[in-house]
Amino acid sequence: AQIDLNITPAKYEKIFGELSSHQCEIIDDKQSKYIVVAAGPGSGKTRVLVHKLASLLLLEDVKHEQLLMLTFSRAAATEFKKRLIDLVGNVAHYVEIKTFHSYSFDLIGKQGSLEEAKEVVQHAAEMIEKREVEPSKIAKSVLVIDEAQDMGQDDFRLVQALMRQNEEMRVIAV
């Protein structure tokens, strides 16, 4: 299978070589519309997500603008970006990896303040539901959610709204 790939054997090894067979199954899965990875702390969920993003970009020909990753902290977003750069290089700079709040502020088209932060995710979800967001801003083929178990009602509503607008969107939740 490696012969057909548009990446070097060394890059292929970097993406798949350090992973367990279960982790490789997740990264190799090109069919499932929904993937949920449930595992304990320290089990490699973050690694799986980063390697899955690398696989999407390099092996499945998903374009960077088709990817959206949502997380709960800027620190997590920064760490993901750093790890992705290590695997795929400069293309990682163009992958949208944001917190739920920063993504929501982007969608509603304004800078965020602490007072507004409480309601911004709900407001963004409402705007998507009412089709008040430019479709190109939310057209994604893959949504990756870090720490999905921490989603509150508003976060989940935002994810549902995105899924309704992108019926073919694959969702990977950890």
Residue ranges of predicted features:
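P-loop NTPase Walker
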Residues: 1-113, 153
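Conserved RecA-like ASCE ATPase "motif II neighborhood" in helicase/translocase motors
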Residues: 108-140, 147, 151-161
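Conserved catalytic network of the ASCE P-loop NTPase/AAA+ motor domain
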Residues: 60-62, 135-137, 164-167
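Short C-terminal domain-edge/linker segments immediately following a structured domain
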Residues: 99-102, 126-130, 174
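The start of beta-strands in P-loop NTPase/AAA+ ATPase cores
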Residues: 33, 94, 140-142, 171
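Conserved helicase motor core of SF1/SF2 NTP-dependent helicases
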Residues: 41-46, 51, 74, 142, ...
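Glycine-rich loops and low-complexity Gly/Arg-rich segments
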Residues: 63, 93-96, 120-124, 167-170
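Hydrophobic helix-cap positions at the C-terminus of alpha-helices
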Residues: 56, 87, 131, 162-165
